[in-house]
Amino acid sequence: MAGAAMAERGRVPPPAPAPSTEGLPRAFLQSLRTLFDILDDRRRGCVHLREIESRWQGTDARELPRGVLEGLRQVAPASGYLTFERFVAGLRTSLLSADGGPRDPTRAPARPGDQPPPPPQRLVFAPADEPRTVLERKPLPLGVRAPLAGPSAAARSPEQLCAPAEAAPCPAEPERSQSAALEPSSSADAGAVACRALEADSGDARRAPRARGERRRHTIASGVDCGLLKQMKELEQEKEVLLQGLEMMARGRDWYQQQLQRVQERQRRLGQSRASADFGAAGSPRPLGRLLPKVQEVARCLGELLAAACASRALPPSSSGPPCPALTSTSPPVWQQQTILMLKEQNRLLTQEVTEKSERITQLEQEKSALIKQLFEARALSQQDGGPLDSTFI
């Protein structure tokens, strides 16, 4: 006997069983998985206890049920990181302690004439394959399978409904046997209290049942929508692009004004000194030079951008944006008018240059004729003075 006692003392105690999610309905586990994924924003597979406490102990978490954080602290390991199984086990522990706590010892005993209290009610979970998952309280005799939630389940009291309107898709799991549907009432009550805790965190009013195929929007306790955050980010990017374009347009406007002043000054100087060889020569430099094709390309791109913006804005009839500038087919754009005016000015300058050259050629022809006439007259006078023997051949 002493040897057996020593053997019992030296035996290592068996390790504590790992937390499991057995005994909870699939739809409830899916809801908890969604909540755990929101808390695990870094996708590490575990969440530290301090992160949960910092999120659930703020000013917006005043309606948090008592014992939730204590239950999570009980199941948390030494490192403080909670996996999904430990997270579910902590919620189950806290909800069981809140639902099945010690009774009031000062309660009076039942009198002989009083009716006996009604039998305890159990939670019946509809399978996750139904369009809506409903929790209803009804007596469940042993050995009888839980009936499916029918149309009458939607007419029950609000306290008996605690499930999303549509079962979210979940990863493939092995089918449970029929005996898994009959669990102890403690785990069923834990599922109901956990549902009420999740509804208290959300703080939203109950909505109408969603249509099949409509996407659910998962929000944190603060009520910030992920889709709204995405839209705000896209609008911020569009704002940055528009501000950059506006800055480039302002700089381009200054450059256009400088070039326009240079062209006007050059026109004025050419008008004052028409006979100057410096400005009237064919090889005189142009104000823009090689930049002229690029300037025309920029003007064309801006015209296409405005035309596309006006076309897209004219499609919706109820557009509240500012009216776009009128771009009619009868009047050409401004950049085309500027190009036409520039070509006309160049044509005028070339015509003027050709006229001046023609006048100069005519003047030189006249001078040549006068010189030839003077030469013939001089030869005639020399022949008369020199006699018949002197002859000059031209």
Swiss-Prot record:
Q: Any coiled-coil ranges, and where?
A: 227-277, 336-384
Gene Ontology cellular component terms for the protein in this record? apical cortex; apical junction complex; apical plasma membrane; bicellular tight junction; cytosol; nucleolus; nucleoplasm
Q: Subcellular localization, per the record?
A: Cytoplasm; Nucleus; Cytoplasm, Cell cortex; Apical cell membrane
Bias type Polar residues, positions: 177-188
Residues of the region (Disordered) are: 1-23, 95-125, 150-188
Which residues get modified to Phosphoserine? Answer: 284
Where mainly found?
cytoplasm
Provide a GO biological process annotation.
symmetric cell division
Q: Which keywords annotate this record?
A: Cell cycle, Cell division, Cell junction, Cell membrane, Coiled coil, Cytoplasm, Membrane, Mitosis, Nucleus, Phosphoprotein, Tight junction
Where does tissue-level expression of this protein occur? Expressed in 5-month-old fetal tissues, including stomach, intestine, colon, liver, brain, lung, heart, spleen and kidney. Undetectable in non-cancerous adult tissues. Expressed in many primary gastric carcinoma, but almost not in adjacent normal mucosa. Expressed preferentially in M and G1 phases, compared to S and G2 phases. Expression is up-regulated in hepatocellular carcinoma (HCC) and colorectal cancer (CRC) tissues (at protein level).
Using the record's annotations, give every residue carrying the modification Phosphothreonine: 219
InterPro entries, per the entry: Suppressor_APCD_1/2
Q: What does this protein do?
A: Plays a role in planar mitotic spindle orientation in retinal progenitor cells (RPCs) and promotes the production of symmetric terminal divisions. Negatively regulates the mitotic apical cortex localization of GPSM2. Involved also in positive regulation of cell proliferation and tumor cell growth.
Q: What is this protein called?
A: Suppressor APC domain-containing protein 2
Q: What is the species listed in this Swiss-Prot or TrEMBL entry? A: Homo sapiens
Q: What is the lineage of its organism?
A: Eukaryota, Metazoa, Chordata, Craniata, Vertebrata
Originating gene:
SAPCD2
